[in-house]
A protein has these predicted regions:
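Ubiquitin-like/PB1-type beta-grasp interaction modules and other compact soluble beta-rich domains
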Residues: 1-82
Length: 83
């Protein structure tokens, strides 16, 4: 499936990219792409971010096994805290 990936904050700076289209069937394959294309440090950072598919957190779905469809958007967003 052709997936649109959006990188934000420190991850975008690290990979020197904010958007790309890749082939992936689930979120785990997106993470594998990040490791192969950008290295272990990028993968480690990506796993600490909020990962959303079409605006919905993967925590509400099947986490890294969340199935993707053609045209889906996977975004890596910084987790913000407040008080």
């Amino acid at each position: 499936m052709q997936i649109n990936v959006k990188y934000r904050a420190h991850l975008a700076e690290l990979v020197k990219n904010s958007n790309e289209s890749i082939l992936a069937a689930n979120v785990s394959e997106v993470l594998n792409h990040i490791k192969k294309q950008y290295g272990a440090q990028a993968l480690k950072l990506a796993k600490t971010m909020l990962i959303v598919v079409n605006g919905q957190s993967i925590l509400l779905q099947k986490h890294f096994k969340t199935v993707l469809k053609d045209g889906d958007e996977v975004s890596f967003l910084p987790i913000c805290g407040g008080g």
